[in-house]
Amino acid sequence: MVWSLEQTAGPMWNDPRFEDFFEALTGNEAWMRALLDSGPVENGPRVMAFLARLWTEDPGLASRPVDRSMATACALELRAADRDEDWMQSRYDYFRDHHADALLNRCYEELETWERRFLARGPQYTSWTSPESLTFLRERICWPRSEYVSACWQAPYRGFNCFGDTVQGWLYYHPFRGAFRCDPEMTIEVGGVCGALSNMGAAAAIANGIPALTMGEPGHCAYAVQTAPGVWTPAYSLSWKRGLHSALHRRTWASHQLAQASFDRRASVLAAGDKARLARWQEAQGEINRADAAWRSALAINGLDEGHWVEYLRFGARHDRDASWWRRTIRLLQESLLPDHPEVAWVLLKDHVFAMILGDASVRDRTTLFNQYLAKLEGWGSGRWNIESAWNWMLERVGDERQQRQFVTNLLRDSIDSPDLGPPFISWTSSRFEDDEDARSAFENILLSKTRRSGEGEDLVLRQMAKTMLPAAAEAHDLETFQRIGKAASRLFEPRPSLAEAGIEPFPGILLSSGGALRIWEPGNRWDSPEAHWGVLEERGGSFHTQVGDKPWFEVELPQFGEIEGIILEGRPGQAHRGADARILVSRDGVDWEQVATLEGAHVWYRVDLSKTRPRARFIRVERDGKCMHFPRVLVYGRRSS
């Protein structure tokens, strides 16, 4: 470990001004391990100089484990140029002082150094974790750990300030600058949209000593909180397409999930760290084969360390290892990361392995390599990821159009039965080969063979595909796939009469349910038509029928958060009693529900007015006691709050 510290410190290792600091550091094994085994150590001289600065001002921190860990985390996060030493000093001082006064969440004391790095880094907006902001937020929002996923709503969602200035322009906050102690206080009074609300939620958690981070999504900002040991919960989130603003390795959710899984095995992290340090030292001594063996030992101990994998693969490239070495490494990598972490495995293969071996490989060999990876997938693993980009990348490297079509056809046979991968694969092929009649014909034949029916060709394929894929996409919260397949299948049905033709007045606002997804109890039962589910949430209409039982239910997942003005439900003439006494519940996360209304009496049309309370939600659930439910239309109206 001492050699590793020397390499990290650079020239300052031999600087007599730091002699006492290095003596204190090297005399404390726990401190050395916290520094070296808590994720990447980058910009080493700057990291070490800052840690020395903190120790020089307060040598006692070395004997206070919590403060020592926080100081180390602050130093490690100075790896990036967008944080300066004085700013980070104030961060350390805040946590040291508030911990001493017992003002932080009790989880703070139990955090490991790698988790404290998220406290040190802070959210996207640096001003939201200034000392003034942190103190304000801790005083204003001091809740149980799990509740910070709702802290974003302390600020109102407002697209325009009281003067009518848009949040998209600089004038939105300009009149109020200097009137408040800090930006979070100003936002609570003035308002904001997704960026401000997400930073509010993450900064509030951080102010109380709870790890959190902000992240970008398509057209939206969200955040995540470590709501329990080892559990990161997305908050104010609309999509699996997340770009993290704070990360140990890559800024993807899958990479973050892998880091948590790795650190859950703390003893393995430390043992693998020792082997990795040995490998680096042996390579520096020119003992390449021994270094190779040490790296393999490190990865055998802990194959979930993404940073170690990158180092080892670069080691192989640096020393021009042969094809057999790369094949063995592929096997070890896939055994370590699949099926639980397919995104990380794919990125490592694409960026580091295939770049070294595909150049001279035949189409047959390339296809074999890709199929070896794909065969080990079992659903999404740790979460939905951009597998479409992987399919595109492979497809471009398996030969001409005929060979590409054959590759996809074979993959379709293997993927179609997967409830996770099947729907997005069908959606991807439909888009990718939209103008290729030969490919579409081949795909239709495969789908027909799966349904074991014959008849109407393309329409039958579409109907059977939607019948299977729409419930699967809704269950996976994959709104993109639900929308793509649902819209395609909608041409199989005539639209229902418009609300105007039926004499029904919509509620104010926009149709929030448009673009969402519908889940029901036991889809595909003998009365249900899953291929018509998409239209239920649109004015054109569709149909669904729950199973018969003690408590039938259905859920609507909105494509964004909304303040709900009202809900319109259309029943079936002659069976209007199916909605009587049903309860309407709303939720922000699909887990915790609040009842907001009851359907009174038996009617063909229900118009549920929620304008007095305007509940904020992303999920709507309708349930009743006994029998079943079926509605051709469930239309949710209101105003966006994301």
Name each model feature, range by range.
Residues 3-186:
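Secondary-structure boundary elements
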Residues 155, 159, 173-174, 188, ...:
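His-Asp-centered catalytic microenvironments across diverse enzyme cores
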Residues 178-185, 190, 195-270:
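Hydrophobic/aromatic-rich core segments of domains that either
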Residues 290-297, 324-337, 364-377, 404-413, ...:
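Alpha-helical repeat scaffolds
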Residues 302, 333-340, 377-381, 415, ...:
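Alpha-helical junction/boundary sensor with strong preference for TPR arrays
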Residues 493-561, 572-578, 598, 633-642:
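Disordered, acidic Ser/Thr/Pro-rich linker "stalks" and the adjacent N-terminal cap
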Residues 547-552, 561-562, 573-642:
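Trp- and acidic/polar-enriched beta-sheet ligand-binding modules for extracellular glycan
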